[in-house]
Amino acid sequence: MVLRLSFMGTPDFSVPILQALLDAGHDIAAVYSQPPRPAGRRGLKLIPSPVQNLAKAKSIPVFTPQTLKTAEQQTKFTELAVDVAIVVAYGLLLPKTILETPRFGCFNAHASLLPRWRGAAPIQRAIMAGDKETGMTIMKMDEGLDTGPIALSCAIPITDNTTTNELAHKLSHIGADLMIEMLSALEKGQLKLTAQSGENITYASKIKKEETRIDWTKPAEFIHRYIRALSPFPGCWCNMNIAGREERVKILGSRLTTRPSLEIGRIEKGPDSLLIHCGQGCLEVTYLQRSGGKVLECATFLQGAHISAVF
């Protein structure tokens, strides 16, 4: 049995799964993605999503509606007559009509071990919380927020230095393998679904702007987790006194040290190192970015920046 699919996704994270479906020879009737976004200083140029770019390169019809709640969009989706909809970080709510249209339903690749970290930012929240593992889950979607029954999952460790960027890369490729495995089982009539546990339920809310500012009164381990979770985007930041001027600087890389903290916000500079005293322990800064500048290793950053204080 050859399944007719639609694919719904938007960012880079979704691309490996779409590519895997194409490489496996699946029939993809259409791709749905978020509308092109304004870019450039004046916002005059519209940039298609990474998923839209791949779909166009493969001559697959692409739809970019603002919503799927209208009768017009739901009719258009119904006319595709797909067996399965694959959803990966699409970014739009799927109403009940859409969920029930595909013959076998809609399946989502979610970057956590459900039911832990349901919601918008599962990778970041897992790192922020200090979780030692996370994973990828393929689930059949229902009307709830990531509450549907689980088809497959795979766990991977989170180390003390894992960043969101690194984890997203690994999980997207794991998700690609799981999605191919899931579709193979579905085609053979062998797919088994398991209801999610009612225990260990947590929610991964969107990252708020106020969470991105570093609070040096927190323990070094806490700050290190946030820097890793928010790197490279949106990035953690603090104010620095550089050559007598206050500047906002992003800290995009750090290392834990064994040094005890002597005074919150105290800085120790070496020829190529920057150590900042936190509420508990000290943090070594490894990558920084001034406003409008490039991401630099600490040694390079210090060559052009005389830092006298952080706050």
Swiss-Prot record:
Superkingdom in the source lineage: Bacteria
Catalytic activities: L-methionyl-tRNA(fMet) + (6R)-10-formyltetrahydrofolate = N-formyl-L-methionyl-tRNA(fMet) + (6S)-5,6,7,8-tetrahydrofolate + H(+)
UniProt xrefs under CDD domains: FMT_core_Met-tRNA-FMT_N, Met_tRNA_FMT_C
Keywords: Protein biosynthesis, Transferase
InterPro entries: Fmt (IPR005794), Formyl_trans_C (IPR005793), Formyl_transf_N (IPR002376), Formyl_transf_N_sf (IPR036477), Formyl_transferase-like_C_sf (IPR011034), GART_AS (IPR001555), Met-tRNA-FMT_C (IPR044135), Met-tRNA-FMT_N (IPR041711)
EC number(s) on file: 2.1.2.9
GO molecular function: methionyl-tRNA formyltransferase activity
Positions bound to (6S)-5,6,7,8-tetrahydrofolate: 112-115
Gene3D superfamilies for the chain: 3.40.50.12230
GO cellular component: cytosol
Pfam name, any one: Formyl_trans_C
Enzyme class: transferase
Family assignment from sequence similarity: Belongs to the Fmt family.
HAMAP family: Formyl_trans (MF_00182)
Function of the protein: Attaches a formyl group to the free amino group of methionyl-tRNA(fMet). The formyl group appears to play a dual role in the initiator identity of N-formylmethionyl-tRNA by promoting its recognition by IF2 and preventing the misappropriation of this tRNA by the elongation apparatus.
The protein's name: Methionyl-tRNA formyltransferase
